[in-house]
Amino acid sequence: MSNIHEHKILILDFGSQYTQLIARRIREIGVYCELWAWDVSEEQIREFAPNGIILAGGPESVTAENSPRAPEYVFNAGVPVLGICYGMQTMSEQLGGKVIQGVGEGEFGYAQVEVQTESALFKAIEDAVSETGKPLLDVWMSHGDKVSAIPEGFVAVAKTETCPFAAMANEDKQFYGVQFHPEVTHTRQGKRMLEHFALEICGCPANWKPSSIIEDAIERLKEQIGDDEVILGLSGGVDSSVVAMLLHRAIGDKLTCVFVDNGLLRLNEAQQVMDMFGDHFGLNIVHVDAENRFLDAMAGEAEPEAKRKIIGRVFVEIFDEESKKCVNAKWLAQGTIYPDVIESAGSATGKAHCIKSHHNVGGLPDDMAMGLVEPLRELFKDEVRKIGLELGLPYDMLYRHPFPGPGLGVRVLGEVKKEYCDLLRLADAIFIEELHKADLYNKVSQAFTVFLPVRSVGVMGDGRKYDWVVSLRAVETIDFMTAHWAHLPYDFLGRVSNRIINEVDGISRVVYDISGKPPATIEWE
C-alpha cells in the first residue's frame, strides 16, 4: 500500500474565511494537506516535510505594525511556495518588495486579469483572449492593500486595470503569488491553477482518494487497537456512522455501538438506525430507550442553552453507565473531523483566532480510563461522506440535511414535552416528504419544521379548534455562515400546510419563516 501521507502540502492560515476551502480544494485534487496557524516553528515545518507551502489570505494589513508574517524558514525550505491574497502580500514584503495600503481602490468581487507572461502556474489556461492576444482569466478578488513593487528575481505575471501585480512569480525558486482567490468557484480556472501547483510544481501524486483513505484508516486502526475492544456512541449521523463502518471493517465484533434514543429524534429514526446498522450491516448495537429520562430531566426548562446542557449531561450519564457494562472496552471512538481539530488548535502567539474548544462527546467523565480513537480527524465533511459511500452507506442518509445534536430539543421552542415532539415529528416528516416528491429537497441546503408554543384558533368543518402552530423553515446557503430563506413555490407551501393541518391532529396553523441569516440564525434556538 502506498503511503498517502508521504507527499503533502502545508497551508499556513492567516485568518481568511476561505482558508479551509483551500485545503478542501487541494484534497479534491488528490493531495494530502494540513492547515496550520501562521506562527508555526521551523522545527515543526521540518518535521512535517511538505512538498510545497501555501500562504493563505487574511483580514489584516501587511502595512500594520505586528501583523502576521510567514516564518522566515518558509522561503529557505527549498520547496515551492504559493501566496494567495494576504499570502502574496506578506511574501512580497518579506522578500524585499513593497505593499501599499488600499485607499478606496481595493478590488472586491469579480475581476478579469490579463496574463502578461508565461508561468508554470498559468500554463495553458485562459477564459478569453484580449485584443492584444493575451490570455484573460475570470477571478474573484477580495483585497484593499496591494503589492506596489515586487521582490528582486520576480516577474509580473498578471495584472488588472487597478492592480499592476495581480500575480507574480520567481520561476527559479518556484515562488508564486496571486492577489485573487483560486480556491473559490468564481475563479473559473482556479482548480487548474491549484492542480498545476500541487501536482506539477510540487510533484505530488494524486493518491488521496476514498479507497486509499479507507485502506490507510483500517490499517492504522488495526495497529492502534490490536486485539482490544472499542465502544462508540452511534447517533445515526454522518460522522458516527462512518466511524462505525470503518471500525467494523477493521475489528469486526470487537466494536460495541451504543445508540441512545433520547426521544428527540425524527420520525422512525431510531428504528431506521437499528435496522440499518444492526440488521443490515450486522454491527453489535446496544439500544438504550431513554426518552422518559431525557424528557423528565428537561421538564419545566424553557431556556435553549439550559436545554442543550441538560441533554448533553444526560447523554454523558447514560453513555458512562453503558460503557461500564463493556468491561473489556479499552478504547472510546469518536467522530471528530478535521474542522473540529482546526478550530481547537489556536495559535502559538494568540494571533490566530480560536473559535471554540472542541470535544466530540463533551464532558465525558475524567475517570473513563480509555484511549481515544478518532479515525476521521484528518477529514473534511465532504470527504467523510465520500468515504461513507465507498463503505456502502446509503446516499440519502449521508447527504440529508443537518440535524442539531440536541435534536427536537431545540426545535420545540420553550419547554419540551412528549406531546409537542410527537406533533413536530409528524409535521416535519410531511414537509420533508413533500420536498422529495417535488424534487426540491436537494435544491435547499436545510429544511425543517419548528414547534411554536402558542395556540391558534382554527375551523374544521362546522367546529372551531384551538390548537398548536408550527413554522416551516428552508434556507439556501454555501457555508451556513450566512443564508437566504428559500423561495419555495406558493402552491408547494399550500400543499404542505394543507397536509399538516388535515393529517396532524393538534396543529391548526402553519407559517413559513422568511428570515435570512443574519439577522436570524438558521435554527430558532
Swiss-Prot record:
GO molecular function: ATP binding; GMP synthase activity
InterPro entries given in the database record: Class_I_gatase-like, GATASE, GMP_synth_C, GMP_synth_GATase, GMP_synthase, GMPS_ATP_PPase_dom, NAD/GMP_synthase, Rossmann-like_a/b/a_fold
Enzyme class: ligase
Catalytic activity: XMP + L-glutamine + ATP + H2O = GMP + L-glutamate + AMP + diphosphate + 2 H(+)
Any matching Pfam family: GATase
tRNA processing listed as a keyword: no
UniProt key word ATP-binding: yes
Cystines in this chain: none
Alphabetic keyword roster: ATP-binding, Glutamine amidotransferase, GMP biosynthesis, Ligase, Nucleotide-binding, Purine biosynthesis
UniProt cross-references to PROSITE patterns, sorted A to Z: GATASE_TYPE_1, GMPS_ATP_PPASE
Residue span, Glutamine amidotransferase type-1 domain: 8-207
Binding-site residues, ATP: S235, G236, G237, V238, D239, S240, S241
EC code(s) of this entry: 6.3.5.2
Any one cellular-component term (Gene Ontology): cytosol
GMPS ATP-PPase domain: residues covered: 208-400
Pathway named in the protein's UniProt entry: Purine metabolism; GMP biosynthesis; GMP from XMP (L-Gln route): step 1/1
Domain of life: Bacteria
Quaternary assembly: Homodimer.
Entries under NCBIfam families matching the protein: guaA_Cterm, guaA_Nterm, PRK00074.1
Function: Catalyzes the synthesis of GMP from XMP.
Protein name in UniProt: GMP synthase [glutamine-hydrolyzing]
